[in-house]
Amino acid sequence: MTADIRKLVHAVPFVPFTIHLADGGQLRVPTVDHIAVPPGGGRVFVFGDDERYDVLSALLISRITVDRESATSSHG
């Protein structure tokens, strides 16, 4: 799953997406500045607009959804 997230992070243009967790939680990633995926791939860091951040185990990520509205509008 981290490989999929890396592809989204490096996409040009960046398209916002949501990470869905196994426990039903979800975290929105509105910009590339709101996420970091270290080289090891076992964890994902998602940053809020405030000083808050979440450290996720990649094993707990159940799916990723791309913001279709942003994806459509970015292509003109």
Where are these regions (language model features)?
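Motif-centric detector for short Cys/His coordination patterns
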Residues: 1-76
